[in-house]
Amino acid sequence: MSKTHELPAVSLPSKLESVIDPEKVLSNKYNYPEFNWNPDIHEQKALARVREMFLNIELSHATASDPKLLQTEGIIPPSDLTDRQDWRSQTGKLDESLGLDHCTFLHWGALHPTGNGRYIFPVEARDILLSPEIIVTPYDIHSTMCTYMMNTDDIRALDEEGQRRLNEYLKTIVPGKDWVDIIARRALRRMQCADDKSVFKVRSHSDLGEIKHLGAISPASLHEPIDIHDQQTMYSKWLSLLENNGLAVSYITNMLEFGSTEDKTALQASLDKSRKLWRKILDIAQKS
């Protein structure tokens, strides 16, 4: 009888696998405080609702390259762009030393300007986030190891402080499936404790993590690109996230907290829809 070969729970670049075992990545979720919480049966049902609602939030990939290239070839990892002068990449030597140049990078719910390029490609989230080719960290490695990014091509040469920072970063790597659970738990707990239970507020483009996909992403997975200078399209996307997913991107969060009375009034109808979404979820969590 032939043996059944199960798909791997997580796939890592070979260089990254040399410094962290895949089994360790699978257990890293317990490094997050969200997994110190033991939800009761009603909260578990509410978490399932949040998880589904957030899986309907598109991923995004911002690019400074010609969008027609991505529409033809998909999102290509930097390792495959060595001789391609028509593409743009922000990959550093430290990324390469960890094999991250074999990954394509996305954000979740960050359909707004991020400084990574003029065009944003929305990408269907569910199949990609839940695939074994996805790993996630809460932030870009550059944010904690910026002084090492461009001059470190061998992680064995890191000084003591660099090694400490790298080890802390490695502890945050989780599979996409676990990241979805972490964010769902974070959102529900925050909304349970918040005075304002109308919307889950995001404050930066990286609040929902840096998504790393091993290998290229097919052009079939990409939606039409958005020009960040097209304010009407951007704003309609933000309102859609508010109304259908109960989430405020950082631009909407700033308008709600620091905007004019006129700005807040314009958002009220969308905010009411978001409040109803969360009210249903919180009611499920509070049942006894």
Regions found by a protein language model. Give the residues of each.
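Active-site-proximal loop/hinge segments that shape catalytic or ion-binding/gating pockets
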Residues: L7-F105, A110-S288
